[in-house]
Curated annotation (Swiss-Prot):
This is Elongation factor Ts. Residues 82-85 are annotated as: Involved in Mg(2+) ion dislocation from EF-Tu. Belongs to the EF-Ts family. GO terms for molecular function: translation elongation factor activity. GO terms for biological process: translational elongation.
Length: 278
């Protein structure tokens, strides 16, 4: 039997995050040499990462970081395979660390984020791979949002009380109004609008909706002369449902979101809604 102590096992667990039995086995194979055991566990961990690549990661958490003065904010989605891991402190600490890094580093896109150093000599991609190995599940970072310049706030929604937030919303107003920002963010969490305004809907989507409306109207046997007016009405209905500004406001459905913003004297510059796995 290799010569090592309980303190060596503890040290190895702290260095690698591996389980006790894995650490003991690694120390046995390394004949008590902690450095060699660390290397062996890292190699084993990377092999485990490769094996998990084909598996699905549909659980996880959304984390937000908002500047104290509300001039900037981020949302980060980190996914895992099971809700058991998602509930765990280690997984949530990893997600929070990445969100804090995004807030400081302001990466241009996901590729830049993964390539950036979260710790000296360690990229975010390596950090995620390390979490993958330590937690024993596929861990995926493939989405984040970052706003700055206006009044930024977030709303986080838990779908289950024992899980971390599964839905996160980031909103940016042109001027401070915490009450309106919170209300609109809650509305977005609940109603999941696809676009901010009618002008933001891609032309190809509008044309597709128009074709569907025309075909549906003809199939209903409506008079050809009435077709343009009916189609336009249905298209306006689509805009009302799909755009945030067109939707009835969740906290006062007699008014549209646009009307609520106008009455408050603010405009919504942009928003992002992230739901884990979707």
């Amino acid at each position: 039997m290799a010569n090592y102590t309980a303190a060596d096992v503890k040290k190895l667990r702290e260095l690698t995050g591996a389980g006790m039995m894995d650490c003991k086995k690694a120390l046995d194979e390394a004949e008590g040499n902690v450095e060699k055991a660390v290397e062996a566990l890292r190699i084993k961990g990377q092999k485990g990462v490769a094996k998990r690549e084909g598996r699905s990661a549909e659980n996880g958490a959304v984390v937000s970081i908002i500047a104290d003065d509300n001039t900037s904010g981020v949302l980060v989605e980190l996914k895992c395979e099971t809700d058991f891991v998602a509930k765990g402190e280690k997984f949530q600490n990893v997600a929070t660390a990445i969100a804090e890094h995004v807030a400081k580093a302001a990466p241009a896109d996901l590729e830049a984020l993964l390539a950036s150093e979260i710790e000296p000599g360690k990229t975010v991609q390596a950090y995620v791979d390390e979490a993958n190995a330590n937690l024993g599940e596929k861990i995926v970072l493939d989405r984040f949002a970052q706003f700055s310049g206006g009044f930024v706030t977030a709303y986080m929604h838990r779908t289950m009380p024992d899980l971390p937030p599964q839905i996160g919303v980031l909103v940016e107003l042109d001027k401070p109004n915490a009450e309106i920002a919170k209300g609109v963010a809650q509305h977005i969490a609940a109603f999941a609008p696809k676009y901010l305004s009618k002008e933001d809907v891609p032309a190809e989507v509008v044309e597709s909706e128009r074709r569907v409306a025309e075909e549906t109207t003809r199939a209903e046997g409506k008079p050809e002369a009435a077709l343009p007016k009916i189609v336009e009405g249905r298209l306006n209905g689509f805009f009302k449902d799909a755009t945030l500004l067109g939707q009835p406001y969740a906290l006062d459905n007699k008014k549209s979101v646009q009307k609520v913003l106008e009455e408050a004297g603010v405009s919504l510059k942009r928003f992002s809604r992230i739901k884990v796995g979707i």
